[in-house]
Amino acid sequence: MSIDIEKAIVRSIDEIVIGPKRLTKYEKARIVAARALQLAMGAPPLIDISSLQNKDPVIIAERELLLGVLPILIKREKPNGEYQLIPLKILADIERKKVEKLNDIIIKHFGEEHSLL
């Protein structure tokens, strides 16, 4: 069964039918690891890192993921061969909202110095 590539690319969160409507921990781990390896090998960061206290490639990769600047498509596939291509930016928006909520709770209970962002 062949799927037209344009039809397979998701344009909004509502179009996701394969897998959860969020970034899974496995997808996140693979993306962060691959990007951290690229950064460690000398690839330029896609964000301004001057404000980061720690210049560790994993920290930079996680920040790039949260900001949705990585030009990556996630391919989610069913056993029968059907698949969807989901731009990371769509899933990163959901991840960022989740982290912002968690950050608000941390600041409320522990103060600004413990902020995640």
Q: Could you tell me what each predicted segment is?
A:
Residues 1-34, 38-117:
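Polar low-complexity intrinsically disordered regions
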